[in-house]
Amino acid sequence: MSPKKVQIKVEEKEDETEESSSEEEEEVEDKLPRRESLRPKRKRTRDVINEDDPEPEPEDEETRKAREKERRRRLKRGAEEEEIDEEELERLKAELDEKRQIIATVKCKPWKMEKKIEVLKEAKKFVSENEGALGKGKGKRWFAFKMMMAKKWAKFLRDFENFKAACVPWENKIKAIESQFGSSVASYFLFLRWMYGVNMVLFILTFSLIMLPEYLWGLPYGSLPRKTVPRAEEASAANFGVLYDFNGLAQYSVLFYGYYDNKRTIGWMNFRLPLSYFLVGIMCIGYSFLVVLKAMTKNIGDDGGGDDNTFNFSWKVFTSWDYLIGNPETADNKFNSITMNFKEAITEEKAAQVEENVHLIRFLRFLANFFVFLTLGGSGYLIFWAVKRSQEFAQQDPDTLGWWEKNEMNMVMSLLGMFCPTLFDLFAELEDYHPLIALKWLLGRIFALLLGNLYVFILALMDEINNKIEEEKLVKANITLWEANMIKAYNASFSENSTGPPFFVHPADVPRGPCWETMVGQEFVRLTVSDVLTTYVTILIGDFLRACFVRFCNYCWCWDLEYGYPSYTEFDISGNVLALIFNQGMIWMGSFFAPSLPGINILRLHTSMYFQCWAVMCCNVPEARVFKASRSNNFYLGMLLLILFLSTMPVLYMIVSLPPSFDCGPFSGKNRMFEVIGETLEHDFPSWMAKILRQLSNPGLVIAVILVMVLAIYYLNATAKGQKAANLDLKKKMKMQALENKMRNKKMAAARAAAAAGRQ
């Protein structure tokens, strides 16, 4: 017996309308729909259920849309007249929440783009038309104002995020390189951009707190011997060759340490220049340590508990494409990037399945390491020999020396940095490591080469500094005799009772010391400039001219130049990364004696970004052995942290142990550079505060604080390792649980199938 169909009949009792006294109002009301028909049904009486009534026919799509449109119009007019009841408000609120949810998640739906756009427009239109109806009574305007401000604030935040993304320098260039060459090459340019930001902060500190105050408030050029070119060098002080070596006018300028005055305060603001010079130098070192460690900890935090390689290729197939891309060029870059990611993943998968001949691999790796040690020893001896020759040349007349003799040491270091990485790359072919492991070995070897070269250079520089200090003692004694003879001759030129003009000697005629601090700054600036020029010439000759030869001579050559020898060059990741780190180490080491070095390095990094991006896209080809770069560049940052530590040690030794020059620089006249701190405490602080600070600087207390910091670092490191291990264990448990659930579901499905087959 089938259930009876029932129907509920609803009668509506309309309210009476108020009569209008004006004929014009009646005409308007005839044109508009009646107000009563737009109001919600107020009085409803349910009739007796009639079981014999026929079932209503289903509505078609047009009728449903018309009824929905009428309901929305009624809601809108009811909102204007403040006559919507609570039931309709709740229903409207639920619909608005649903539409907002659609707006937020429409791009995640597996629909066609046309359907997404249509649904999005419809949802936005519904929200904009009916959002104001949620306000009731006197609070409706305030609610509408709050909703409007919320929309504007959300739009402002979205535009601000877009603005911040647009302000990231060279983002499009790096994305294009990543799509063509993979994440390994792009990681170098990301590292270069990060180094550019670090050097920008260092330049702002040195320029605003050292160079600019001296230029604005210090004594002008020619007022003191330290700010004047000697008389013997005036004729050639502005020559290009002299300026290229950073002598002449460049030496006696704000670019170098020796130009700065040793007065405690300068200018109308009583700016303490010596104190500022010392604190900015220490601040640059501290900031560099802080920013490197912060970047490393951030990358470790992003790394989480390790990569989850479950269903790696499935995720790449179904989730790699961005369906909101509308630019054809961006789409091409995205396509190339996805292709490169698949190549990297396939290489990673194959590398884990390779079977090796263990004994042959061990022999080849031993042979490669033997050749590496020979190369490192030979390069160290070559630099030592070049330093000895440079010391011999320093004792000769500069006019008798040629260009090579003057720049031999810098050129030898630059050439070793250019050719030794190529040899290490050839040795790495014997070892047959995974590409990522081979890159780390190569970086480590080049790092050892450059670090050894740098410390050989520093040891030679320390010998030169000691010679300058001994020379200063003789010059100081000679200046005392010169002053005594000048005063004696001046007094002898007048009689006993006569008066003459005041005694005056032009600053260019005053004898002066060698100023070893300026000499150190000049060496680092020359080394930086020569390294930049060597890098650019190498790119032009080794990449651009080689690419032109292969491209245009391939048609008339005996063999295929593109796939045979010489072919196009691959981008040397290891050499470029180590050159960048080595150059930054020289900046940290020399910026205390040459405040202009961070500015010079900014120009170098800025031009390198454009020049190397052009060279990569124009002259290089992707590597034959692709590999995925580490998600965190902590390997690069770790080497940078090590070079930072090793670069600041000689600087701190010079600050603490060596006496400053007596006639140049902001610390002249003091026994040690750090004495400027004690002078400031004595003159500018109360005695009790100076006493407290001296007690805090007690070596026993400092050693205790350092020990506590080491223990805290050890504890935090152990805690972090434990948390990472716990995360890995949880991931394993979740995988095992998922596998068990999968097996249980399979067994249940098999049991159901067997039961169904048994019933049949």
Curated annotation (Swiss-Prot):
<feature type="modified residue" description="Phosphothreonine">
    <location>
        <position position="45"/>
    </location>
</feature>
<dbReference type="GO" id="GO:0060117">
    <property type="term" value="P:auditory receptor cell development"/>
</dbReference>
<dbReference type="GO" id="GO:0032420">
    <property type="term" value="C:stereocilium"/>
</dbReference>
<dbReference type="GO" id="GO:0005245">
    <property type="term" value="F:voltage-gated calcium channel activity"/>
</dbReference>
<feature type="transmembrane region" description="Helical">
    <location>
        <begin position="272"/>
        <end position="303"/>
    </location>
</feature>
<dbReference type="Pfam" id="PF07810">
    <property type="entry name" value="TMC"/>
</dbReference>
<dbReference type="GO" id="GO:0009897">
    <property type="term" value="C:external side of plasma membrane"/>
</dbReference>
<keyword id="KW-1009">Hearing</keyword>
<comment type="subunit">
    <text>Forms the MET channel complosed of TMC dimer (TMC1 or TMC2), TMIE, TOMT, CIB (CIB2 or CIB3), LHFPL5 and PDH15. The interaction of TMC1 and TMC2 with TOMT is required for the transportation of TMC1/2 into the stereocilia of hair cells. Interacts (via N-terminus) with both isoforms CD1 and CD3 of PCDH15. Can form a heterodimer with TMC2, TMC5 or TMC7.</text>
</comment>
<dbReference type="GO" id="GO:0005262">
    <property type="term" value="F:calcium channel activity"/>
</dbReference>
<feature type="topological domain" description="Cytoplasmic">
    <location>
        <begin position="554"/>
        <end position="572"/>
    </location>
</feature>
<dbReference type="GO" id="GO:1903169">
    <property type="term" value="P:regulation of calcium ion transmembrane transport"/>
</dbReference>
<dbReference type="GO" id="GO:0060005">
    <property type="term" value="P:vestibular reflex"/>
</dbReference>
<keyword id="KW-1003">Cell membrane</keyword>
<keyword id="KW-1133">Transmembrane helix</keyword>
<feature type="modified residue" description="Phosphoserine">
    <location>
        <position position="37"/>
    </location>
</feature>
<feature type="region of interest" description="Disordered">
    <location>
        <begin position="1"/>
        <end position="80"/>
    </location>
</feature>
<feature type="compositionally biased region" description="Acidic residues">
    <location>
        <begin position="50"/>
        <end position="61"/>
    </location>
</feature>
<feature type="topological domain" description="Cytoplasmic">
    <location>
        <begin position="431"/>
        <end position="434"/>
    </location>
</feature>
<feature type="transmembrane region" description="Helical">
    <location>
        <begin position="701"/>
        <end position="734"/>
    </location>
</feature>
<feature type="modified residue" description="Phosphothreonine">
    <location>
        <position position="400"/>
    </location>
</feature>
<dbReference type="InterPro" id="IPR012496">
    <property type="entry name" value="TMC_dom"/>
</dbReference>
<comment type="function">
    <text>Pore-forming subunit of the mechanotransducer (MET) non-selective cation channel complex located at the tips of stereocilia of cochlear hair cells and that mediates sensory transduction in the auditory system. The MET complex is composed of two dimeric pore-forming ion-conducting transmembrane TMC (TMC1 or TMC2) subunits, and aided by several auxiliary proteins including LHFPL5, TMIE, CIB2/3 and TOMT, and the tip-link PCDH15.</text>
</comment>
<feature type="transmembrane region" description="Helical">
    <location>
        <begin position="634"/>
        <end position="657"/>
    </location>
</feature>
<feature type="topological domain" description="Cytoplasmic">
    <location>
        <begin position="304"/>
        <end position="359"/>
    </location>
</feature>
<dbReference type="GO" id="GO:0032426">
    <property type="term" value="C:stereocilium tip"/>
</dbReference>
<protein>
    <recommendedName>
        <fullName>Transmembrane channel-like protein 1</fullName>
    </recommendedName>
</protein>
<feature type="transmembrane region" description="Helical">
    <location>
        <begin position="360"/>
        <end position="390"/>
    </location>
</feature>
<feature type="transmembrane region" description="Helical">
    <location>
        <begin position="435"/>
        <end position="469"/>
    </location>
</feature>
<feature type="transmembrane region" description="Helical">
    <location>
        <begin position="403"/>
        <end position="430"/>
    </location>
</feature>
<keyword id="KW-0225">Disease variant</keyword>
<feature type="topological domain" description="Extracellular">
    <location>
        <begin position="221"/>
        <end position="271"/>
    </location>
</feature>
<feature type="transmembrane region" description="Helical">
    <location>
        <begin position="573"/>
        <end position="593"/>
    </location>
</feature>
<keyword id="KW-0597">Phosphoprotein</keyword>
<feature type="topological domain" description="Cytoplasmic">
    <location>
        <begin position="620"/>
        <end position="633"/>
    </location>
</feature>
<feature type="topological domain" description="Extracellular">
    <location>
        <begin position="391"/>
        <end position="402"/>
    </location>
</feature>
<feature type="compositionally biased region" description="Basic and acidic residues">
    <location>
        <begin position="30"/>
        <end position="39"/>
    </location>
</feature>
<keyword id="KW-0472">Membrane</keyword>
<dbReference type="GO" id="GO:0008381">
    <property type="term" value="F:mechanosensitive monoatomic ion channel activity"/>
</dbReference>
<feature type="topological domain" description="Cytoplasmic">
    <location>
        <begin position="735"/>
        <end position="760"/>
    </location>
</feature>
<feature type="topological domain" description="Extracellular">
    <location>
        <begin position="658"/>
        <end position="700"/>
    </location>
</feature>
<comment type="similarity">
    <text>Belongs to the TMC family.</text>
</comment>
